[in-house]
């Protein structure tokens, strides 16, 4: 009997405890649970915001890095084509557009001489690729041989600076003539300033009255004189095959400007090149004649590394 009473009392105590717990304890547990859930939601929102900020900054970075390619793509595929009186054969047009597309994040320039008339050039409108790429540098023929001077050089030299182009001057080398006289002709004609491109030696012909060793020796004389005058190694301009066959073993230390008009993605797969003249039939907005168009294999900051201090 007493055992039954004890069981009854224990049951009543447990029942009373359960009633107390049901009234008071769930509220505290629920509040704690709600706080935990709320904290988790806040943490989740914070993580989402962090991910959003990272994604947003990444998109800005990618957009900035690829802005030139985006502008080029839009201009070539969605923008109405700018009118120009000049035309190229379809194959040449496609080749030029493909190269420009590959290097659309690089720096483009032109080279001109007295063959381009003054009245044919609008210096304020020099662009390519349907207006999406500005011409940023220009190479001007200054001298030829021991006494030749380009008749438009002085005017083009001043005008290119006024229009904030990085300007460069080149000497057309005549292998039959004395290299010292040729170097002096260039130095007397061209007064390079800070921000101008290094002097450029244009080599296109081999001599008939000299050996190749004598020819290379003469070139080194010109380069040495001009380098001593400006304190920087001149840039060598020549054709791909000419460089490969006659120059590459002796002039590897000089910045290289290659001309190659073939249907290729690079002017040379072996030589380390800085500039590529990829067409002599370039159609440039602002010029009414076809011109040589070049690409520098780098950005503006790197191009300025090839200018005089």
Residue ranges and their predicted role:
Residues 198-270:
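Catalytic domains of cell-wall/extracellular-matrix polysaccharide-remodeling enzymes
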Residues 147, 176, 243, 265, ...:
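Flexible, glycine-rich phosphate/dinucleotide-binding loops
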Residues 59-77:
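Membrane-interface motif at the C-terminal end of an N-terminal transmembrane signal
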Residues 1-37:
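N-terminal targeting leaders characterized by basic, low-complexity, disordered sequences
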């Amino acid at each position: 009997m007493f055992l039954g009473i004890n069981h009854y009392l224990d049951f009543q105590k447990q029942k009373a405890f359960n009633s107390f717990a049901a009234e008071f304890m769930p509220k505290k547990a629920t509040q704690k649970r709600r706080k935990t859930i709320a904290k988790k939601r806040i943490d989740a929102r914070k993580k989402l915001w962090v991910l959003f900020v990272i994604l947003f900054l990444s998109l800005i970075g990618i957009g900035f890095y690829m802005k030139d390619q985006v502008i080029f793509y839009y201009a070539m595929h969605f923008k109405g084509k700018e009118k120009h009186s000049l035309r190229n054969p379809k194959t040449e047009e496609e080749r030029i557009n493909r190269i420009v597309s590959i290097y659309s994040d690089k720096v483009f320039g032109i080279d001109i001489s007295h063959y381009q008339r003054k009245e044919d050039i609008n210096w304020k409108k020099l662009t390519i690729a349907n207006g999406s790429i500005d011409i940023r540098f220009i190479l001007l023929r200054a001298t030829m041989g021991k006494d030749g001077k380009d008749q438009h050089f002085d005017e083009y030299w001043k005008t290119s600076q006024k229009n904030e182009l990085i300007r460069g001057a080149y000497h057309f080398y005549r292998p039959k003539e004395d290299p010292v006289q040729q170097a002096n002709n260039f130095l007397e004609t061209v007064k390079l300033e800070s921000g101008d491109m290094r002097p450029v030696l244009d080599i296109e012909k081999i001599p008939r009255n000299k050996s190749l060793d004598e020819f290379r020796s003469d070139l080194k004389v010109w380069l040495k004189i001009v380098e001593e005058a400006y304190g920087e190694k001149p840039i060598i301009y020549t054709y791909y095959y000419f460089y490969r066959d006659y120059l590459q073993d002796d002039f590897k230390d000089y910045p290289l400007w290659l001309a190659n008009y073939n249907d290729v993605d690079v002017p040379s797969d072996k030589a380390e090149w800085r500039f590529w003249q990829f067409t002599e039939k370039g159609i440039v907005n602002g010029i009414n004649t076809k011109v040589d168009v070049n690409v520098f294999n780098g950005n503006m900051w790197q191009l300025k590394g090839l200018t005089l201090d």
